[in-house]
């Protein structure tokens, strides 16, 4: 459960991301593909090379979903219900991959905003991404 302080930290951090969200989403995906090559199996139809338009487009989808989640911190299940259905029933993504992408998102945010990536911000963003992952995997059961 996100505390009021966590919610404030997440909103502040995501506010600094601003218009860079799609770029950071794509960068996090690239990090994930390079660091955890098994994740590529979910994207056999993608050009996974650096700067790929397909990775950029999917990065934007990730960023848009996270932006929506930040706007609905008190109702993540409601805000992400359609994505949960998609990932559980159609795409059948292994739940561990959400944790891997979350880690890569944290690394990307820290790389771009080192002075803002305080221990408190890191902890709050980690909790937020864990909650998003939990919601996205909730319909696997």
Swiss-Prot record:
Q: Which residues carry this modification: Phosphotyrosine?
A: 24
All disulfide bonds of the chain are none
Gene Ontology BP terms: hydrogen peroxide catabolic process
Query: Per UniProt, which keywords does this protein have?
Result: Acetylation, Heme, Iron, Metal-binding, Oxygen transport, Phosphoprotein, Transport
Task: Tell me which residues bear Phosphoserine.
Answer: 3, 35, 49, 102, 124, 138
List the InterPro entries.
Globin (IPR000971), Globin-like_sf (IPR009050), Globin/Proto (IPR012292), Hemoglobin_a-typ (IPR002338), Hemoglobin_oxygen_transport (IPR050056), Hemoglobin_pi (IPR002339)
Respond yes or no to whether keyword Phosphoprotein is given for this record: yes
Q: Which residues bind heme b?
A: 87
The GO molecular function terms of this record are:
haptoglobin binding; heme binding; iron ion binding; organic acid binding; oxygen binding; oxygen carrier activity; peroxidase activity
Residues that the record marks as modified (N6-succinyllysine) are 7, 11, 16, 40
The entry's O2-binding residues are 58
Q: In which tissues is it expressed?
A: Red blood cells.
The GO cellular component terms are: blood microparticle; haptoglobin-hemoglobin complex; hemoglobin complex
Determine if GTP-binding is one of this entry's keywords.
no
Q: Where is the Globin domain?
A: 1-141
Q: Which residues carry this modification: Phosphothreonine?
A: 108, 134, 137
Q: Which residues carry this modification: N6-acetyllysine?
A: 16
The family line of this record is: Belongs to the globin family.
PANTHER family from the UniProt entry: HEMOGLOBIN FAMILY MEMBER, HEMOGLOBIN SUBUNIT ALPHA
Q: How does it assemble?
A: Heterotetramer of two alpha chains and two beta chains.
Function, as annotated, reads:
Involved in oxygen transport from the lung to the various peripheral tissues.
What's the protein called, per UniProt? Hemoglobin subunit alpha
């Amino acid at each position: 459960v996100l505390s009021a302080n966590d919610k404030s930290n997440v909103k502040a951090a995501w506010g600094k991301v601003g218009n860079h969200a799609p770029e950071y989403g794509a960068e996090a995906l690239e990090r994930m593909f390079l660091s955890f090559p098994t994740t590529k199996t979910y994207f056999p139809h993608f050009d996974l090379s650096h700067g790929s338009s397909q990775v950029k487009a999917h990065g934007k989808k990730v960023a848009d979903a996270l932006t929506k989640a930040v706007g609905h911190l008190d109702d993540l299940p409601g805000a992400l219900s359609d994505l949960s259905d998609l990932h559980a029933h159609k795409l059948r993504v292994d739940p561990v991959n959400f944790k891997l992408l979350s880690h890569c998102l944290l690394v990307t945010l820290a790389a771009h905003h080192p002075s803002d990536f305080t221990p408190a911000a890191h902890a709050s963003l980690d909790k937020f991404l864990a909650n998003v992952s939990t919601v996205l995997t909730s319909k696997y059961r």
